[in-house]
Amino acid sequence: MPTQKPSKASVKPTKKKVDPVIRKKKAPDGAAAKGAKTGAEEKEELVARDVVAEATEKLKKKKKGVAPAMGDDVDPEEAAEEAAAAVQVDPDAVEDDIEEDPVAERKEVKDLLAAGREKGFLTYDEVNDALPADIVSSDQIDDVMSMFGDNDIEIVDAQKAAQNNEIKPTVTVEEEKEDADEDEKDEDDEPGGKSNDPVRLYLRKMGSVSLLTREGEVEIAKRIEDGEKEVLRALLACKVAVEEILDIGNKLKTAKLRVRDVIKDAPEETQSEGAEEAPEEVGEGDAPAQLAQSELNKIEQICKQIERFRKFAQDCDVLEEELSSKKKLTEVRKKEVKQEIKDLRTKMMEVLEEMRLNKKQVDRIVINLKALIERVDKAEDELRDLERRYDCSMKELRPQLKESRENPNIGKKLQKQLNLTPEQLEVLDRDVRTAVRKIKKVEEEANLPVESLRRNYDAIRLGERRAERAKSELVEANLRLVVSIAKKYTNRGLQFLDLIQEGNIGLMKAVDKFEYKRGYKFSTYATWWIRQAITRAIADQARTIRIPVHMIETINKLIRTSRYLVQEIGREPTPEEIAEKMELPLDKVRKVLKIAKEPISLETPIGEEEDSHLGDFIEDKSLVSPADAVINMNLAEQTRKVLATLTPREEKVLRMRFGIGEKSDHTLEEVGQDFEVTRERIRQIEAKALRKLRHPSRSKRLRSFVES
């Protein structure tokens, strides 16, 4: 068998015991690296490990002055030789290497010492990775550990180091890319080729996006802000948009709009929903009055800002009228007016930034502008259809049609030119005027020429696209954060992909509301939104019967209290004990316990083979049990035999009176009418028949049914 290279020895000492382990060198690339070890090789490594461990333990005891026990007189150098022999290494070569290259002078050990002095500790993994492969003897390992002790360097687990020093393992972009490439390679090596698992595909795609630094987040946030400012600047150039903004104040005053629908800083709707769902949780204090007063103050502040905006808008309108009037202005005055308009729009922009106008309002205004543009496009499409139909240019045709209304000769010329009858020319003229009228109506509503309106709308769309592109980059770069948070909420009623989807919705909300100027990292801000979106989705969708959010919180609190009491008293707590611990009324605790019950499917498989279902074991109380059915059949048979011993008249009277074999029982009057006798006679016949039935010869057949 060929000689094998020595394996590294990694030492994980504790205060009580030193346990060196043979650390394997990384296998070279190729098929040999992928092959499994033979049983003989594994056995040799285990033998070497035991020998080195025993030698190291003896050395420690010797240094502490502890006399070796019986069977412990093993020399460390002999142990090193045995370990080297176990892995088929020449001990003389090892000794020569040690003499020529002392452990303390090795570059790897020096680097370890430098890193340990800087941090104050080293992890076992760092020591194992850095130690050379030829350090296998207990003396060498002990020398290394002694050097760490002399330099006050503690050897700890990686997990303990992270907890004690609050160190979170960081992964660089390059490492993540390498991991992603390795995962993809592993997936490609699978027997079935690339995996079709949607979670795996999503994670692979997610891993291809680079992480962002704080500077990258700020740069993207600035691009989002610039795009939104472009939209607002384009809106200010449209008078119809300015009028929509001014109308917000009136809608606030008349309560047609709420504060949270107008500005970004208002409380979220989710908070108010919780308040609506749990009215009994609200105390009798002044909180509602304070909220109402706060909203009134906010409305007053917004109205003041809108009044300032109105003043600037009116001044801007006056200057624009002056600029567009037929009155001739000097070039100097024109420049002054244009500069004043620009300054006023800058001030209007500042007011909008102070207001922090909600994106819903901006989107609503943009939608209104889009509706105007669509009306213009529709009218222009009608004109183009007429051009194609009559093979003419509308730019030349419109003046001619206008002249033809006043001059019949021009109309005849047009008829000949277009090969139309007078009626067809009249229809063409009417269609053209209708389309032109639609365009002019839009211009009147927008108070702008169509060209300016379209130019402003294009600027709005450009700003929106830039902002959306930047938002998309910020979202894609933080998808890992969503996955890491969603992992903590698995097995709560929603699938993992659903949790990721809900978390992504929360992430997009966080992107919309992120303010980089406050100095916080985006992940810090987004974590709350992601967690809130996931928990709300679990509360809304995880249960078959939806439970309000405030009740979910109460249920979770009750479950935590119940677990605490189980640990404290050693058994399941009673509702009374839970109510006392939670300081809640007993009725409410019982109600919460009842609500917390989960529905279970009747198709739930039962048994090891799962060949039966839960529904098979549930009693159907709407059906008669087989035992009762047999008893009833026997009772009917015995009753029929007993009645057969009476006279036919007596039998029929009893049957009609007690409803035996009849649809219902009958009164004495009804039976008397059937027999054409009086009620008294029927009563006498009934009494006589019952006396006969009470005779032991007949009653013994029915007595067992009465007793049972």
Swiss-Prot record:
Residues 29-38, 82-91 have a biased composition (Low complexity). Residues 642-695 are annotated as: Sigma-70 factor domain-4. GO terms for cellular component: cytoplasm. It comes from Myxococcus xanthus. Pfam families: Sigma70_ner, Sigma70_r1_1, Sigma70_r1_2, Sigma70_r2, Sigma70_r3, Sigma70_r4. Residues 668-687 bind DNA. Its main location: cytoplasm. This is RNA polymerase sigma factor RpoD. Residues 474-544 are annotated as: Sigma-70 factor domain-2.
